[in-house]
């Protein structure tokens, strides 16, 4: 049979393997079937607490109202948008109007997942609670426009991130 005639190669990534190497290996091996998108790869290396944080952020009522339910999360698109907000908000220095230790979006998002993996449950809950407040404020301000360019219904990730970071820093 086809299965029995197939040769398998197995690589074990042990605990001593650097985390950024794990991201790189996933990206290189990720070629068969339906390829994983970057957020799905990050999800494999996130702790259950971080996965729950992103899932809760992307499914909370405040986020749904602020985005008018316009972000599809079938392949973790909404979770990636929430992580993008955490990254930009963490790396952006509001006083200097500049980024601290920013490595480009993809690498910064990878690094943020690894950093969030080290957070205590109370720190992750704080991120979720702050996010809920920001999304409530965004909904009150933007109402039916929900992070969209005029005349469009699709959520603009840059507008979402910008508004969310500005609202966070206004508090």
Predicted regions and their residues:
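Basic- and aromatic-enriched surface patches that contact anionic nucleotides/nucleic acids
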Residues: 1-103
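C-terminal subdomains that position terminal phosphate/3'-OH groups for nucleotidyl transfer/ligation
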Residues: 82-171
